[in-house]
């Protein structure tokens, strides 16, 4: 059974902007190299609508994979994995190995984790916050980028208290810090 990992880049002030990750572009090459290695262990990606629409370019726009050898590896890894999109508004999905679920359901996620050929990542702060509320997330992995956005969508939602234990940290030459935390215990009131 795979672990459910909330994995995302974030600015130092805890925001991801408005869902447009262009602010993380100066750090992309080194981050991509690190993530591609770790994502080889991922069997399934869970997305909300907006994050799915952002990530679908790795299959629908060949120019993304042609930017660098690391981008080509990531595109191949992403396309080979299963994807589940949780959305009540998306009409259909348009990438291979992808299915649509209308809402995040604890039982559905438990089945995905049990059947996945590796770990499962969840992306998108709204979907991840709901998964944290439902006590589904096993690992929180944040890529802290040395930039302040001053507002936007918070990477971690208010109203969810969880105890976390630092399992690893890695510093990149470009100032990014990758911090991996294991979720300890259950949801706190």
Located regions from the model:
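Enzymes that bind and transform nitrogen-containing heteroaromatic metabolites
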Residues: 1-189
């Amino acid at each position: 059974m795979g672990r459910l990992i909330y994995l995302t880049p974030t600015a130092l002030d805890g925001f991801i902007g408005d869902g447009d990750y262009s602010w993380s572009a100066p750090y992309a090459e080194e981050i991509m190299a690190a993530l591609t290695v770790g994502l080889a262990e991922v069997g399934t990606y869970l997305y909300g609508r907006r994050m799915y629409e952002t990530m679908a370019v790795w299959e629908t726009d060949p120019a993304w994979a042609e930017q660098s050898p690391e981008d080509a590896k990531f595109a191949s890894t992403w396309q080979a994995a299963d994807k589940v999109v949780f959305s009540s508004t998306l009409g259909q999905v348009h990438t291979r190995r992808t299915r649509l679920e209308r809402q995040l359901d604890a039982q559905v996620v438990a089945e995905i984790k049990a059947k996945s050929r590796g770990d499962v990542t969840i992306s998108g702060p709204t979907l991840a916050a709901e998964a944290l509320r439902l006590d589904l997330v096993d690992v929180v992995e944040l890529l802290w980028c040395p930039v302040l956005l001053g507002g936007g969508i918070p990477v971690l939602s208010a109203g969810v208290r969880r105890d976390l234990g630092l399992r690893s940290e890695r510093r990149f030459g470009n100032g990014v810090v990758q911090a991996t935390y294991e979720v300890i215990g259950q949801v706190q009131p």
